[in-house]
Amino acid sequence: MNKVITSKEAILAISCKMAAKDGIQALNMRSVASACGVAVGSIYNYFPSKADLIASTIEMVWRDIFQMDEGYKDIYSFTDCVLWIFDSVCESAAQFPDFFTMHAMGISTSDKETGRRTMDRYLEHIKQGMLIALQRDKEVRRDAFDEAFQMEAFVEFVFGNLWTLFIQKQQSCDILLEIIRRSIYAQSHDEPR
């Protein structure tokens, strides 16, 4: 096989395409090298192990799904934030089917911890963005939160329910948005924007 000079980004782009088409379990050093048209050693130059390749691929998929820095900049409503996250995942679901379940099912035991750490890092980033949107939302009732009903716990609750909707492949988060509205906004709060 001719050695082709490539980059880590090019390898990850091919690896993501393979994961989207065949699932994360299809990734291994040989299959990625073959798809890239390079020797297996070229892949090892960038990724010392299959676990590193898979973790980097998962991280790239997360980056593609949640372009958080761009999406959160102009969101000042918590419900808009939740809807934006839901829509972002739904749009990406067609490209990366079963992404949320592939971590548990498609990664070998030795690779699961690396994949889990990568996923947890992105999920924490999402939750922090949700908390910021909640704190900036001027429509939230002043008495909505207290010691017994804290913002952080509410974000965890909403995110957990979003996650459930993703795994169930639901097409709408309307009921969750209504629960949010009834919980933290004044009764006269407008319908979804």
Where are these regions (language model features)?
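Helix-turn-helix
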Residues: 10, 14-52, 56
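Hydrophobic alpha-helical connector segments
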Residues: 56, 70-95, 151-155, 177
